[in-house]
Amino acid sequence: MVQGRQAGGHQGGWLYDEAERITTFELLTQALKLSCVPLIASGGIADAKAVRDALMMGADMVAVGTAFLTTTESVIDELWKAKLLSACAKDTHLTRLFSGKLARGLVNDYLREFADIDGVIKHAQIPPYPELNAMTKELRATAKHLKDPNLMSLWAGTSVDKCRDESISELIDRLLN
């Protein structure tokens, strides 16, 4: 799996923060030079052009994530789904604030309030995963119960603007044509 910075949710682990800033296609180019195993491109892939581009570059497969969250078959919270359907790439941000592990999600009041101690921009010290994840578990559960998207972890990739209220079948058709 070759996952670029555009991917939503928790990111793959890296040894260096600079590597966390590499795009999917930059990372795929590097991986193709060094690897002889099948490669799956992931991150920012949510339309037919991105699928074609990744495959033409040499990826053996692609993984699509965020676009499936708004399908009619998805079981995510309706508030999260509504936020995804009205968002664009600039509404997403890499953060460690919910779990201690780098993840991309929609910016909300929680992320804005604690941006100074996020640890992504200023490398501040915050508890690592899984400690911070355990510390925020009750917050996330309460936010879901209260239907408060400003305290939820609303994971989303930068291709969020490609999300549609459609069936999985319609999404697959759109990805392939």
Give names to the regions the model predicted.
Residues 1-2:
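A structural preference for short, pocket-lining loop segments at secondary-structure junctions
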